[in-house]
């Protein structure tokens, strides 16, 4: 389920159609109960597995309406925690917000969480300036997330994967930029028993092509 999109501000992100008119009112409870009874009776006759999936999706949506609004509300997070994620600085505020949301969803038992950045990394020009700015925006928040997971006893049970769809070429393109390079780039993992300091595979001397594993 998407919470906003990568181009939107984290503070404005919400789940589409999360709230309906009179959410969790007695009237809505009656509607959901009647819908469940009708779907269940139909499933007993047809044994259609797709209908079973529909029933479970409605049940999940109803539970999300009750839980998700609280999860995306950061008002009860302390100033210390916000600062840990870099939310006290303009450069790191947005991605810090995203990483803090990820920790809250992890605490709630969400099994897979994707945290995205805006589409600002495609540096076909001015790579040094652009990547310096972009790296600054994510370094503090992601380190804050890792530290927060550790201090809450969640680090050893949470696999954090930092990756991208491709890297950049080691040769110049345009005005001091770099082209896409899917042939050799880095992904790092942390937590969940991953061995610290271990690297797998290597590239050639220019960092252009993967040559081992």
Segments the model singles out, each with a brief description of its role:
Residues 1-213:
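Ligand-binding pockets and gating/stacking loops
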């Amino acid at each position: 389920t998407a919470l906003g999109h990568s181009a939107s501000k984290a503070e404005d992100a919400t789940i589409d159609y999360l709230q309906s008119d009179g959410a969790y009112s007695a009237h809505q409870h009656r509607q959901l109960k009647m819908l469940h009874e009708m779907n269940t009776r139909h499933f007993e006759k047809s044994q259609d597995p797709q209908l079973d999936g529909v029933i479970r999706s409605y049940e999940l949506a109803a539970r999300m309406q009750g839980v998700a609004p609280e999860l995306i509300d950061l008002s009860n997070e302390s100033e210390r925690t916000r600062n840990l994620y870099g939310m006290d600085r303009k450069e790191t505020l947005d991605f810090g917000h995203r990483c803090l949301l990820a920790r809250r969803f992890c605490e709630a038992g969400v099994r897979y969480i994707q945290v995205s950045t805006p589409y600002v990394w495609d540096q076909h020009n001015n790579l040094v300036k652009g990547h310096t700015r972009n790296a600054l925006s994510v370094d503090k928040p992601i380190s804050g997330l890792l530290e927060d997971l550790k201090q809450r006893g969640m680090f050893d049970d949470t696999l954090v994967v930092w990756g991208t769809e491709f890297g950049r070429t080691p040769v110049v393109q345009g005005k001091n930029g770099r082209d896409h390079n899917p042939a050799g780039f880095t992904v790092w993992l942390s937590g969940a028993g991953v061995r610290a300091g271990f690297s797998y595979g290597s590239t050639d001397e220019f960092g252009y092509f993967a040559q081992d594993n």
